[in-house]
């Protein structure tokens, strides 16, 4: 029996981060966490592309643009922050962004991690951005690198 498992190493990996700017300081914490993790795990700055988009809704179309650009990425990390408000806007955006990221990952057979915070309130969002707890940008980058390594082994 063969068992395959990826290792979270950025050495020789070409990775992109697509990060939304909306909900600025929280979104910035996710992108910064992902960037620093890439470097801490042996990645070279010239192998990391960071693209900032206005909001989370713009993440999927930007992912598709990167995926069809001719540059071969090993993985992509999608970072954004959606905080529930009083209308249904949050539900529509969260559902569509999540579904499209998953579809693109399957269509292009590439690890694209979902580091988009979907939180009921700003305090919960901060908890997922590393200020009061874990950082989804960090865990998203680690998962992306582990999956990229696994895909190379399969």
From Swiss-Prot:
Pathway in which this enzyme or protein is active: Cofactor biosynthesis; riboflavin biosynthesis; riboflavin from 2-hydroxy-3-oxobutyl phosphate and 5-amino-6-(D-ribitylamino)uracil: step 1/2
Matches recorded under InterPro entries: LS, LS/RS, LS/RS_sf
Residue numbers binding (2S)-2-hydroxy-3-oxobutyl phosphate: 86-87, 128
GO CC annotations on file: cytosol; riboflavin synthase complex
UniProt-listed Enzyme Commission number(s): 2.5.1.78
Active site: 89 (proton donor)
Keyword Lipoprotein found: no
Transferase recorded as keyword: yes
Reaction equation(s) it catalyzes: (2S)-2-hydroxy-3-oxobutyl phosphate + 5-amino-6-(D-ribitylamino)uracil = 6,7-dimethyl-8-(1-D-ribityl)lumazine + phosphate + 2 H2O + H(+)
Annotated 5-amino-6-(D-ribitylamino)uracil binding sites: 22, 56-58, 81-83, 114
CDD domains assigned to the protein according to its UniProt record, in alphabetical order: Lumazine_synthase-I
Listed GO biological process terms: riboflavin biosynthetic process
Gene3D superfamilies: Lumazine/riboflavin synthase
Alphabetic keyword roster: Riboflavin biosynthesis, Transferase
GO molecular function, one term: 6,7-dimethyl-8-ribityllumazine synthase activity
Domain of life: Bacteria
Entries under Pfam families matching the protein: DMRL_synthase
UniProt family annotation: Belongs to the DMRL synthase family.
Function recorded in the entry: Catalyzes the formation of 6,7-dimethyl-8-ribityllumazine by condensation of 5-amino-6-(D-ribitylamino)uracil with 3,4-dihydroxy-2-butanone 4-phosphate. This is the penultimate step in the biosynthesis of riboflavin.
Protein name (Swiss-Prot/TrEMBL): 6,7-dimethyl-8-ribityllumazine synthase
Organism expressing this protein natively: Chlamydia caviae (strain ATCC VR-813 / DSM 19441 / 03DC25 / GPIC)
Gene responsible for this protein: ribH
